Amino acid sequence: MASKIFFVLAVFLVMSAVLPESFAGCKKLNSNCSRQYRECCHGLVCRRPNYGNGRGILWRCVKAKK
């Protein structure tokens, strides 16, 4: 029984190391983000959107350009 619990914990630790965005509650599209942390969901990047009048002030999660 103890080995099964240990196995589940080991799998969880490996998964959280490999897929941090799925466990840490990643930031969705257009959410505020901070540049130094990779907190946007998979396929999103943290950028300052350009709203036509220069650069935006807030960093947001936006779709990464291919």
Curated annotation (Swiss-Prot):
S-S bonds: 26-41, 33-46, 40-61
Region forming the signal peptide: 1-24
An example Gene Ontology CC term for this record: extracellular region
Domain of life: Eukaryota
Keywords: Acetylcholine receptor inhibiting toxin, Cleavage on pair of basic residues, Disulfide bond, Knottin, Nematocyst, Neurotoxin, Postsynaptic neurotoxin, Secreted, Signal, Toxin
Domain-level remarks: The presence of a 'disulfide through disulfide knot' structurally defines this protein as a knottin.
Function statement: Alpha-toxins act on postsynaptic membranes, they bind to the nicotinic acetylcholine receptors (nAChR) and thus inhibit them. This toxin competes with alpha-bungarotoxin for binding to orthosteric sites on muscle-type T.carlifornicus (IC(50)=408 nM) and human alpha-7/CHRNA7 nAChRs (IC(50)=14.16 uM).
Note: Negative results: does not show activity on rat TRPV1, human TRPV3, rat TRPA1 channels, the human ghrelin receptor, human neurotensin receptor 1, rat ASIC1a and ASIC3 channels.
Name of this chain's protein: Alpha-actitoxin-Ms11a-1
Protein species of origin: Metridium senile
